[in-house]
């Protein structure tokens, strides 16, 4: 297991490339899972250097993710690598019909994902002393190229 604390989107995707290359050099059949938590919290190099009152820096994350996902999906496409991203839901303002929720970072992640699962907190699990010891969650498969979509657990 390898843990990295990376602050920018660029650093995250460079690290993914390096991990995939090194693992494939040593063992081509090894099962690998790479978890990125959380993409919404990561900044870009432009955001880190820019002033908040200047326009244009907010879209740079989506552009970087789009370019990186095209490259990464080609690298891991036919290998035994699971790339898992956690992201945050944001509410779209003024939506009258359809899903009012979206994820940050543009449309590249939803497009390139083979499976997307939305988790929702539905309650708490408490012990006999009424201390919270866990959370009840609902999982909804909202995209699945590997099986039937729109299932719940």
Protein language model regions, located:
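Conserved inter-motif catalytic segment of the P-loop NTP-binding fold
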Residues: 1-71
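Phosphate-binding/switch region of NTP-binding enzymes
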Residues: 57-153
């Amino acid at each position: 297991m390898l843990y990295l604390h990376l602050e920018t989107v660029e650093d995250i995707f460079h690290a993914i490339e390096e991990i995939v290359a090194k693992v494939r050099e040593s063992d081509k059949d090894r099962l690998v899972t790479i978890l990125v938590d959380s993409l919404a919290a990561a900044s870009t190099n432009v955001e880190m250097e820019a002033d908040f009152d200047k326009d244009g820096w907010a879209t740079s994350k989506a552009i970087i993710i789009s370019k990186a996902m095209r490259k990464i999906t080609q690298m891991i496409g036919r290998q035994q690598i699971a790339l898992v991203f956690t992201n945050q839901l944001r509410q779209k303002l003024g939506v009258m019909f359809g899903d009012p929720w979206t994820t940050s970072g543009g449309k590249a992640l939803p497009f390139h994902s083979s499976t997307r699962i939305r988790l929702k907190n539905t309650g708490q699990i408490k012990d006999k002393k009424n201390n919270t010891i866990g959370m009840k969650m609902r999982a909804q498969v909202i995209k699945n190229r590997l099986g039937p979509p729109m299932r719940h657990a």
